[in-house]
Amino acid sequence: MTTETIEATREGTLWREAPPYFDDLEIGDSMESSGRTVTEYDVVSFAALTGDWHPQHADAAWAKESPFGRRIAHGMLVLSYALGLLPIDPRVVLALRSIDGAVLKRPVGLGDTIRVRARLADKRVLGAETGLVTLAVRIVNQADELVARMEIVVLWRRQTEAAEAPPSGDELSPLQDGRLLA
């Protein structure tokens, strides 16, 4: 997916025009992704990577007799795609901190297309350079039916002199030694 395909809006403007820093964000801001169609290749690759060869995902004959009547994508694949579909800029979104309250509401089958809608639910300053942003994420299919929801917390860069200037030798950035100091 290219930047041009992202359809993320914030009060009528595209978030891709300039990355919003933490202090620019407001509770209630929202974004929506473009669509992503789940394919046979996606499901088989995910099964190979994770070792999850449950017949609901991998065996067409078995899945046909299941309550879903067809093969479906792994729930974790759907949630992973949702994270990847979020139109957020890596210059300001530094890390995923947590995934909370993930609920899978209906199956996503091969050939289904998912989209992500996210709303900024909360934010708090973590330090001079970063803050934590909570996004309420809803994943919908091509019929606009809710397939999953979750809340994610991400580490977001603040636009401050401390964030713009590299740390001096004696200062520790919250990310400098590879772990988040909070």
Language-model features, listed with the residues they occupy:
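Intrinsic-disorder/low-complexity, polar/charged segments enriched in Ser/Thr/Lys/Arg/Asp/Glu/Gln
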Residues: P20, E26-S33, T113-R115, L132-T134, ...
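Short intrinsically disordered coil segments
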Residues: T134-L135, E151-V154, P166-P174
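Hot-dog-fold acyl-thioester-processing enzymes
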Residues: T2-R97, Q159-A182
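A structural preference for long, well-packed, hydrophobic secondary-structure segments
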Residues: A95, G101-R106, A148, I152-W156, ...
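Hydrophobic beta-strand core residues of beta-sandwich domains
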Residues: F22-L25, V38, I72, A102, ...
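Hydrophobic beta-sheet segments that form the core/acyl-binding groove
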Residues: S98-Q142
